[in-house]
Amino acid sequence: MLHKSILQVALKCSCIDMTDCLRQFLAFGAKASSWCRKHILWSVESIEESEEVQEEEHSRILPEIISMTLNISIKLLPSAAKCITVDMVHTIGDFISELLSLTESSMADKKIHGAGADIARAAPIFLDEAAKLCRVYSEAAKAEDCKMSIPDEDTTVKHSERGLASEVTRITSSTIQTLCKLGTYAASSGGSQVALLNVSWKGTVSLLQSGKGMIEEKVNVREIILTLLSLSIESMRVAAETWCTPLLETLGSSEARRAFLPIKFFLINAVRICSAYPSEAMAIYKNIIRCALAITSASILFSKKPQLKAANEALVELLEPTLFVLLDTLMKSSEVTPESKCQLARYFFENEEANGSDHMGQANREEINLPSLDCIFSMDSDVDLRNRALLPAELIVFLHFLNASPWLTEEVVIELSKKLQSLLNILTSEDIYSYVLGFEIPALYGADHSPAVVWQPVYTCLIQAMKTFMLSAVSSSAAWNELEAFLLENLFHPHFLCMEIVTELWCFFMRYAETETSINIVNQLFLLLKIVASPEGVLVPLSALRKVAHSVCIILSYASSATVDQVYTCMLNDENPSKSSVLHLALVMEGFPFDSLSGGIKELAVKKMFTSFAGYLESYSKNHRAINVPTSSWGVIGFPVHALASALQRCEIKDDSIIDEKSITTMFKFTISLINMYGTASDSVAHSVLVHFV
């Protein structure tokens, strides 16, 4: 009771100007704090029955004494911020240290904190004032350091300024450490310590920002970032475990947002610290990526449950932008070396590269289909990413970097271009390509001030990201060489999805590339077409020749008229006419875009086909309706028939003068003859001839 009475008097005196007696008040406050901490320890250890009455009285009065001590300190700190001398700062440092220890002990001890609502109100205010004091001292110390850089004859002053910086560093570092501990405690309190949570982490961030260049040796910045990441993942894990149990009702948007707001708070503070200390953040880039993968995996889990649609949309709206800003902070910083940025880009799919594409469909099949929450939300950055549960999330995060490629450095763009093959490799996994083809994911679109959540297929997101990356790669010759090699090597990828993606990229390239560039690329494709050309394969739909021709025709359908003209001219001017005919037929049968030819060349092409067909019919009539077998090894039976029939299906012919009545009559006679031959064929030779036409 005596201590309480003394503190009541001190609290009244603290309301007046204390400048002249500040040192005495600080010493008094430090002793009061020390006394309170000792009695907190005593109250925890006091368990004997004989002491129960005394303990009850003690537990009732002690919270009041602690609250008054904190309130006195709140009054003292603004005055202390005005007294910036080495001796005074040293005294204030001892005072702050005692008060921080008292605050930590009283907030963490349930026995004391549960009995004192006043402590819960006073502690955040004291911590906020302590953070303000540290910021003022940090600015003063930096200003004095600037003065020290100017030659001065007074060496005594120089010595005292160095002492000031040392004392400020001591106070600031101890304050940061206490704020982190209390912030972690408040995060685990189930939402009952919102004020303490806000003050603790905001104070931590502001002191790290203002103390940069002074506190790095005293404060483990990496550990603070890891703590925030861990809190984010743990909060997401709790929400996911709660929601992924069978739900009787659809989850509401407000409930989902309430669960995600603390996570956003942790991520925002992590972003601010990483922005101030990018080199420290880069040292733990694997943990940062792991956090991104965990939260993205949660989004993927939610997308599988219609009841969690609101949760998924809230996650994309509240968390995903901040999550990607956290990753972008490392890539944008000028303090991070290009090699470190490339190292981050190389991290994606590295386990899949180590195991090879054959591993994708073998081991861990159960883990792919039944991903565990424990695996997804593990904070161990060394967990083997061969666990398939994280691959869909890794794909989504990688697509973010492809979308961000316009502002990435050239070195990083080159590294990303080298990862495209690994991207295709993981798409061959059954569960990955089924996810790409069968799922929709939410994404933010629209103006910055009012973005809207739009659901779109994963495949669409994948294609858009790769197209964005193509546009970025053009500005770097090295990146474009990698990309061009990737497109050429995978144009005929054995997996249907990969081939579809690469073909789509080729079409995008042909649509927007300069004519000279597109002609050079198509010439390379045409050389490949010549390599696989054979008379045996031209009439076999799934032969190598027809597959290549099919891809070339799709690509040419998006090319300019000049490019299509170039390909057609190359076919006409080939040194081997018979081989040229085979190439011509393969392209025509796979849909060569005649309508994309310029006017004069298209007219010439159509006339040539009709002329060839008319000549074939004339020969057929002169031969007494016997089908000629070509003498050349490159000849194709009925070549003019196949060419014209295929062209007529896809080419719009407006000139009626090309076909006269006599030609039409001959066509019908030829068709009737083929039908009759098919019905009367008796030997293998006749049947083989008919197969070429049917």
What are these regions (language model features)?
Residues 18, 30, 47-63, 78-89, ...:
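Extended coiled-coil alpha-helical stalks
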Residues 81-85, 111, 191, 216-219, ...:
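Charged, low-complexity interaction regions
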Residues 14, 18, 55, 62, ...:
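Short inter-helical turns and helix N-cap capping residues of alpha-solenoid HEAT/ARM repeat scaffolds
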Residues 472-473, 489-494, 510-512, 527-531:
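Solenoid-like repeat scaffolds
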Residues 226, 282, 286, 296, ...:
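Extended, charged low-complexity segments
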